[in-house]
């Protein structure tokens, strides 16, 4: 019996992101027409990507970003992020748009009285 390590790595990544963000993993997120988003929080739709072996670079596809934003909107989310790793068990990095970046900077500066 062969195992699909890519799915195992993906499931582990999704669980880690959900735990870190206080969200929940979406079951079968890519398997339905109007589904999507590997992790959902109260305010964020997160799509997760990772390689099956370590990489020194990782290309972000415009189609991923467009599909993510479309699916997020369809499900009532106004913020989305693409999470990726350079290796299956590595650190997660998050790609956000300029509006969310501005919100993040404003929030951090307000919290730190800057």
Question: Where in this protein do the model-derived segments appear?
Answer:
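Catalytic phosphate/metal-binding cores of nucleic-acid and nucleotide-processing enzymes, i.e., regions
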Residues: 1-114
């Amino acid at each position: 019996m062969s195992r699909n390590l890519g799915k195992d790595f993906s499931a582990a990544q999704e669980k880690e992101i959900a735990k870190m963000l206080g969200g929940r993993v979406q079951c079968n997120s890519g398997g339905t027409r109007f589904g999507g988003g590997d992790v959902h929080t109260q305010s964020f739709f997160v799509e997760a990507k990772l390689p099956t072996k370590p990489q020194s670079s990782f290309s972000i596809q415009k189609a991923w970003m467009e599909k993510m934003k479309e699916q997020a909107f369809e499900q009532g989310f106004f913020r989305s992020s693409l999470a990726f790793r350079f290796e299956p068990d590595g650190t997660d990095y998050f790609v956000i748009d300029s509006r969310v970046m501005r919100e993040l900077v404003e929030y951090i500066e307000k919290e730190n009285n800057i």
